[in-house]
């Protein structure tokens, strides 16, 4: 803020003892605060009525600079506190030349009304300090924070430099460093400096109303200003009701005012403001309030209503009755004492007050009844019940213990009579083992008794059909018992006379048996695995905790945001259903217990007559006297609303009811009804909530499948991986279908695997110097494949001279980068080439070792190296350390030793490392069609409906298949590995150009089809387009082009297309059935079992597979299986410390890659139409995203006003389908009808009635 001023208050220097002029604080005016002004800004002053401000500068921008001097809150000394800052002059009045007091009080009521809106009395005798006294105060001030003085050099004309000291807070320059009082050094007697003693010597501190500690309401009192404003509001409201002659409202306002005065008294006690002046003022305040209450009641009882109304309506106070004037005078005195008490306390307006109203601690109350995983900050710590740190400190401080965490809290208390020095000597036990006697004994989640079912189950229930079957099976078992209980209730209603008391006890017993059978369902509802929805919320958060290496583009973010908004209400309804389940079961138990009571209404008088939240503070927006009356009436009318009685009245109870009326007894607004009818209704509700639980579990399962279905169809494997991260079972993924490949689909068949057992037996018969050294470190699987092993063992098996395992060799060379670095891998091969002979060999044994092992191993090493550089080399494998291996020298040595294949190895090494241009040498040759595309050969675009419908579906599907198969053939195994590994093993992989182009083409095709439909305004043309694309998808299926077929289906089931009900009605049913059959083929249930069966039956036919399944298999196999195996010994809990490579994981990856490569070998025998292909390619560019298409969809078919209730048993085929099934009005009404709370006794809740 600028300090431009018209008057400067610091120009006159003050000379010190040596005669040097020093700039100092010199006020130019003195003003008194007339209105309260509060601010949180550090450079502005917070003002109270009556404060004196010494003005230093009057700024031209409307803000003045001043100094405020107050006495310290510590009344034991006369120290001063100085505040300097900006303040608005409109809240003050100048008193420098007006040294006069406030006019004497003439009319008490008018002055009281003038001060209702927080206008405290001004000082009658303001004391203004002289300049000398003011400077003395400035020298002896006690600052809130220690002032920082910065040395600043100042150059004068003679060239010398002078050092000044500048304080930014005061904006003051000094020639010498001022002497300021420092805080006294804490002595050893201060027990708070010692952690061990402070726990027992610390004072009990009140728990403050911190928003970070509690779930506060908007109307909660946090600061002194809020409390003062609230109390004054009730004061004004009480007086207004008194003068308005409204007795019932007056008593209500007086009751609320008394409650607020009680809060004030509690605050003074909690803040330890117990000086004599405070005690006396508080006593006078309470006494005055009591006197006012008594006099007001006398006024209402002794004076008739009409007379009171006439007296209160008198505008002249002198014509009012003496009793009313006395009441108003007492009330004014009460208001004066309240302001006096506030002035004496002299608190800091920004100090947070102690918490008085009951509120839930944050992140702690969710473990009482139902578990809410969305409240956990650490999503993977399902079993963690640690309390929040702030809650621990607050509760411990309230008990006089200074604790930072759970372990510092004593395990038990020794008793109040123990001295502080011997109370706690032993270390505190862990918090989780503490049961009774601690300060957290009554805190939810602090003991084992309050733990939920979640903490007792090790694994959550997955969201699948198996879990749903468990719920259904349990419900069927409960239905049979429940029907019998309903039958008994009906018999009672039909024949009450023969219904014995013993039968009531029997029904009560069956109720408990029924409820105990509900525990498995509660267990499932409590422990459902909602990890995918938790991850969805975290993905939508800007500060997500996932790896930064995961790239999420704008389209993915749009999809995640859309999914989160459409699923949020389902999750909200699910948790409401759980609470509704709890309410129904509780009511079921209570009603069953009432059957055994002689008087079922015996506990009714214990019910509170006041509505819930009666004493809650009012919102700041409602603290306006003009509309407070209407708002209060509306609130009370809402609270006393009563639902219509659904229960059949009991004739005997009605007789009792009329007798009570005749006797003028208080019946507390009870509704008497037949308990058997209530029991039957409770059974029906219990039956319905069981059905409701199955419905919601089924909905969560379907929404999970829809979410993964969309991600899989759009080939967003990164989104799928993030959504499933941390889900139970995700870490132990079993490839299932992917591991079982037919012989015709297997590219590399190892015919020798059948003889592996015989070969391993033959190795044992060899001499020790010819046996492999690391055979004991190999782990074999049941399919005669290597499951794992150490690095040395795998290299030894790779270069074995007798056993050539072709599948192992290919798997190793493809996936070696997940085991070794390139330098490390080649170093192992060179070490294997230079094998050292075993010790203690004779001459004949050495010659045999060289002939039968060393030379063959050298040949295998050269062969493996040559194959690696020739067929499996990737530019991303290059590393700077490879130059240290001198591979060309190694190849030349092999040539000198006449090793087979060494010449070809030297040629490959020179080509890769000396001639450069590795990427150009190894990059696949581009096809002629791609070169033509780059020469900007543009065909006619399919930009209109007529141009699309003019193309024959067979021709369109044929050319689409040719184009997509060509793109599919450009996908390499390195593209697939790059897609799943990313930067996991190396940062030089880069992008996956072939695979990214294939995925981009499929997504563009989906957007093109959906956009072609929504941009058409005519409904009949849209219907023709739908049928046209369905026929194209059918022909794509006949051509085994599952990629294009899935892209078309995804477009037709997208949110912007599926919601067009009028357009779909114009499509003939046979065509819609055809679409359903295509969608059923790509159903993601059971890991695309229908599609996998269809794909497996193709054998040698050409095909363009749906790549989303491959991406899911690759992602799950890589992320769901560990890189290393841990072998367990015979002793429990003892593990082998040596790491064994999980080679089975690499084998599964290669199995999937084999199938991908297999479909690249068989080509289509179709004639290529270059014009159609170019039109298709060019039409897919510059298509709007899904959000723009959805807006167009709303334009051509707006949302209906009335909600269409969807079939709850229908299976939504994609995440976008259910987006429009619910409207806001529908959601609200459904929740209200489905989760309405029950009350056994329908009692009106309202304020106490007072007759006039």
Curated annotation (Swiss-Prot):
Residues 409-454, 623-648, 1201-1252 are annotated as: Disordered. Pfam families: RasGEF, RasGEF_N. GO terms for biological process: cell division; Ras protein signal transduction. InterPro entries: Ras-like_GEF (IPR008937), Ras-like_Gua-exchang_fac_N (IPR000651), Ras_G-nucl-exch_fac_CS (IPR019804), Ras_GEF_dom_sf (IPR023578), RASGEF_cat_dom (IPR001895), RASGEF_cat_dom_sf (IPR036964), SH3-like_dom_sf (IPR036028), SH3_domain (IPR001452). CDD domains: RasGEF (cd00155), REM (cd06224), SH3_Sdc25 (cd11883). Residues 26-97 form the SH3 domain. Residues 782-914 form the N-terminal Ras-GEF domain. The keyword Cell division applies. Coiled coil: none annotated. Residues 1239-1252 have a biased composition (Basic residues). GO terms for molecular function: guanyl-nucleotide exchange factor activity. Residues 416-428 have a biased composition (Low complexity). Suppresses the CDC25-5 mutation in yeast (restores cAMP level) and has similar functions as CDC25. This is Guanine nucleotide exchange factor SDC25. It comes from Saccharomyces cerevisiae (strain RM11-1a). The lineage of its organism: Eukaryota, Fungi, Dikarya, Ascomycota, Saccharomycotina. The gene is SDC25.
């Amino acid at each position: 803020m600028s300090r431009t001023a018209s008057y400067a208050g610091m120009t006159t220097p003050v000379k010190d003892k040596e005669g040097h002029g020093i700039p100092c604080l010199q006020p130019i005016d003195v003003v008194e605060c007339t209105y309260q002004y509060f601010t949180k800004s550090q450079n502005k002053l917070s003002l109270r009525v009556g404060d004196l401000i010494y003005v230093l500068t009057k700024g031209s921008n409307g803000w003045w600079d001043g100094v405020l001097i107050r006495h310290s809150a510590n009344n034991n000394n006369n120290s001063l506190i100085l505040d300097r800052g900006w303040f608005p002059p409109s809240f003050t009045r100048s008193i420098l030349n007006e040294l006069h007091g406030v006019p004497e009080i003439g009319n008490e009521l008018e002055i009281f009304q003038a001060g209702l809106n927080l206008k405290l009395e001004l000082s009658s005798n303001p004391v203004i300090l002289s300049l000398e006294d003011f400077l003395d105060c400035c020298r002896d001030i006690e600052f809130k924070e220690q002032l920082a003085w910065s040395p600043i050099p100042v150059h004068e004309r003679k060239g010398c430099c002078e050092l000044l000291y500048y304080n930014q807070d005061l904006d003051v320059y000094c020639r010498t460093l001022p002497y300021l009082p420092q805080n006294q050094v804490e002595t050893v007697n201060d027990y708070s400096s010692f952690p061990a003693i402070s726990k027992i010597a610390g004072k009990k501190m009140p728990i403050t109303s911190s928003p970070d500690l509690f779930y506060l309401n908007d109307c909660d009192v946090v600061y002194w200003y809020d409390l003062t404003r609230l109390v004054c509001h009730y004061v004004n409201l009480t007086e207004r009701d008194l003068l308005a002659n409204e007795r019932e409202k007056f008593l209500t306002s007086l009751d609320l005012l008394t409650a607020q005065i009680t809060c004030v008294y509690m605050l003074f006690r909690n803040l330890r403001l117990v000086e004599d002046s405070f005690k006396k003022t508080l006593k006078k305040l309470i006494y005055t309030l009591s006197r006012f209450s008594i006099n007001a009641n006398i006024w209402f009882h002794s004076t008739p209503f009409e007379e009171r109304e006439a007296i209160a309506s008198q505008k002249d106070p002198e014509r009012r009755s003496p009793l009313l004037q006395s009441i108003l005078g007492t009330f004014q005195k009460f208001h004066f004492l309240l302001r006096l008490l506030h002035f004496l306390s002299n608190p800091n307006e920004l100090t947070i007050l102690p918490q008085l109203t009951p509120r839930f601690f944050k992140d702690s109350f969710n473990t009482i009844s139902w578990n809410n995983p969305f409240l956990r900050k650490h999503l993977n710590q399902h079993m963690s019940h640690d309390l929040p740190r702030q809650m621990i400190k607050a509760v411990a401080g309230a008990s006089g213990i200074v604790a930072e965490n759970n372990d510092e809290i004593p395990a038990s208390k020794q008793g109040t009579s123990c001295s502080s020095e011997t109370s706690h000597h032993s270390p505190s036990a862990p918090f989780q083992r503490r049961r009774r006697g601690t300060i957290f004994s009554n805190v939810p989640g602090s003991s084992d008794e309050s733990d939920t079912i979640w903490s007792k189950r090790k694994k959550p229930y997955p969201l699948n059909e198996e879990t749903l079957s468990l719920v259904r099976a349990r419900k069927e078992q409960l239905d049979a018992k429940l029907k019998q209980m309903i039958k008994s209730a009906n018999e009672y209603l039909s024949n009450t006379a023969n219904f014995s008391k013993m039968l009531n006890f029997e029904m009560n017993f069956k109720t408990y048996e029924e409820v105990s059978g509900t525990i498995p369902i509660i267990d499932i509802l409590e422990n459902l695995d909602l990890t995918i929805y938790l991850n969805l919320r975290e993905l939508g958060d800007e500060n997500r905790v996932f790896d930064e290496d995961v790239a999420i583009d704008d389209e993915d973010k749009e999809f995640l945001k859309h999914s989160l908004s459409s699923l949020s209400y389902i999750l909200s309804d699910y948790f409401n259903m759980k609470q509704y389940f709890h309410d129904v079961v509780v009511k079921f138990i209570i009603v069953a217990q009432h059957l055994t009571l002689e008087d079922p209404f015996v506990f009714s008088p214990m019910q509170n007559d006041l509505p819930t939240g009666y004493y809650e503070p009012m919102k700041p927006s409602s603290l306006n006297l003009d509309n407070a009356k209407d708002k209060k009436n509306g609130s009370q009318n809402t609270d006393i609303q009563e639902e219509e009685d659904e229960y059949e009245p009991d004739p005997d109870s009605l007789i009792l009811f009329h007798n009570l009326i005749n006797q003028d007894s208080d019946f507390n607004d009870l509704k008497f009804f037949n308990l058997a009818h209530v029991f039957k209704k409770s059974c029906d509700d219990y039956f319905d909530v069981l059905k409701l639980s199955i419905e919601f579990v089924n909905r969560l399962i379907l929404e999970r499948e829809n979410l993964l279905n969309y991600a899989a169809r759009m080939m967003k494997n990164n989104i799928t991986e993030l959504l499933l991260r941390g889900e139970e079972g995700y870490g132990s993924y079993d490839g299932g279908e992917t591991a079982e490949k037919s012989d015709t689909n297997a590219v590399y068949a190892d015919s020798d695997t059948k003889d592996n057992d015989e070969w391993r037996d033959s190795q044992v018969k060899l001499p020790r110097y010819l046996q492999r050294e690391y055979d004991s470190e190999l782990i074999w699987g049941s399919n005669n494949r290597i499951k794992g092993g150490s690095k040395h063992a795998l290299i030894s098996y790779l270069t074995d001279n007798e056993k050539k395992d072709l599948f192992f060799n290919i798997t190793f060379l493809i996936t070696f980068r997940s085991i070794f670095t390139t330098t490390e891998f080649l170093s192992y091969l060179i070490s294997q080439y230079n094998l050292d002979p075993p010790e203690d060999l004779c001459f004949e044994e050495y010659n045999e070792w060289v002939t039968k092992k060393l030379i063959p191993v050298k040949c295998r090493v050269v062969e493996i190296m040559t194959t690696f550089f020739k067929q499996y080399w990737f530019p991303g494998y290059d590393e700077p350390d490879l130059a240290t291996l001198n591979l060309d020298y190694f190849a030349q040595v092999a040539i000198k030793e006449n090793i087979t294949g060494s010449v070809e190895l030297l040629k490959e090494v020179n080509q890769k490392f000396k001639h450069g241009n590795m990427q150009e040498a190894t990059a696949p040759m581009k096809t002629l069609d791609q070169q033509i595309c780059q020469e900007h050969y543009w065909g006619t675009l399919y930009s209109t409906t007529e141009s699309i419908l003019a193309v024959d579906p067979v021709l369109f599907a044929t050319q689409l298949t040719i184009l997509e198969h060509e793109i599919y053939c450009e996908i390499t195994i390195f593209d697939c590995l790059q897609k799943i590994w990313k930067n996991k093993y190396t940062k030089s992989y880069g992008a996956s150009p072939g695979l990214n182009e294939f995925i981009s083409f499929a997504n563009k095709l989906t957007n093109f089809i959906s956009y072609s439909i929504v941009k058409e305004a005519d409904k009949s043309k849209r219907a023709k387009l739908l049928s046209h694309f369905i026929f194209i998808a059918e022909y794509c299926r006949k051509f085994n082009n599952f990629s294009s077929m899935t892209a078309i289906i995804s477009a037709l089931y997208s949110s912007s297309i599926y919601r067009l009900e009028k357009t779909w009605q114009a499509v003939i049913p046979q065509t819609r059935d055809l679409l359903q059959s295509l969608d059923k083929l790509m159903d993601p249930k059971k890991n695309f079992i229908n599609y996998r069966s269809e794909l497996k039956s193709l054998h040698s036919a050409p095909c363009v597979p749906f790549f989303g399944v491959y991406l899911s298999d690759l992602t799950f196999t890589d992320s769901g299986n560990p890189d290393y195996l841990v072998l367990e010994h015979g002793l429990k809990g003892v593990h082998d410390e040596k790491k064994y490579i999980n080679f089975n994981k690499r084998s599964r990856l290669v199995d999937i890659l084999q199938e991908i490569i297999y479909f690249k070998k068989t080509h289509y025998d179709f004639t290529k139409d270059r014009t159609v292909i170019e039109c298709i390619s060019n039409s897919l560019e510059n298509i709007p995203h899904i959000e723009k298409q959805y807006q167009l969809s709303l334009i051509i078919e707006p949302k209906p006003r009335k909600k269409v209730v969807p079939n709850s048993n229908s299976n939504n085929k994609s995440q976008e389908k259910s987006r429009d099934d619910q409207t806001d009005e529908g959601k609200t009404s459904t929740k209200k009808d489905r989760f309405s709370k029950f009350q056994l006794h329908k009692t009106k809740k309202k304020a106490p009635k007072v007759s006039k």
